């Protein structure tokens, strides 16, 4: 909090007028990052020529492993929602539901075999995959150096490559196994 108020040129007391805890600030940052993501996703889905490959590429590109949605998403349930007023968490979740619903509607229009409820679940599943893959990617210089050892080479993963492979399989199976696919 001290660094934030100093960078903003505010007094610490002013911060607490707007946010009761630092977690509420992080929740607000997460909300803003999600809004930005959904805006870009919805714009892309509005382009009728986007196919499954293009959708997966967009999703992974937007969630680069250093992106705020990955960093804050990993803290969501365990940290951010623990020290936050219930009303702030509810506001965040209601906003998320609204954005998910809008994106799911566009996904259903683009891929009609997936109903809107399933489309919303698939977005959440896709995000879960990216959070999981990001946890396996080295995040410190020491971890990165260790993976240069040929004996540890099998552990060296590329975020985009691994994420795309998993999401392609996930989405292809959803499209193939949807009730509308006879």
What do these predicted ranges mean?
Residues 28, 42-69, 95, 122-126:
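Hydrophobic alpha-helical connector segments
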Residues 37, 50-71, 156-181:
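N-terminal hydrophobic signal/anchor transmembrane helix of membrane proteins
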Residues 65-87, 138-146:
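Amphipathic alpha-helical segments used for helix-helix packing
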Residues 111, 115-123:
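Membrane-interface starts of transmembrane alpha-helices
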Residues 98-113, 129-182:
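C-terminal peripheral helix-coil segments that are non-catalytic and often amphipathic
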Residues 1-24, 28:
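Helix-turn-helix
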């Amino acid at each position: 909090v001290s660094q934030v108020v100093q960078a903003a040129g505010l007094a610490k007391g002013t911060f607490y007028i707007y946010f009761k805890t630092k977690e509420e600030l992080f929740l607000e940052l997460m909300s803003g990052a999600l809004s930005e993501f959904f805006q870009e996703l919805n714009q892309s889905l509005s382009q009728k020529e986007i196919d499954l490959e293009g959708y997966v590429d967009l999703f992974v590109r937007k969630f680069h492993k250093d992106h705020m949605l990955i960093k804050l998403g990993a803290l969501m349930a365990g940290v951010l929602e623990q020290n936050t007023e219930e009303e702030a968490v509810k506001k965040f979740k209601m906003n998320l539901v609204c954005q998910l619903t809008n994106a799911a509607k566009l996904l259903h229009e683009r891929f009609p075999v997936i109903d809107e409820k399933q489309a919303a679940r698939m977005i959440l599943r896709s995000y879960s995959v990216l959070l999981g893959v990001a946890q396996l990617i080295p995040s410190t210089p020491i971890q990165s150096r260790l993976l240069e050892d040929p004996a540890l080479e099998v552990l060296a993963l590329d975020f985009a490559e691994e994420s795309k492979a998993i999401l392609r399989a996930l989405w292809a199976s959803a499209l193939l196994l949807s009730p509308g696919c006879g």
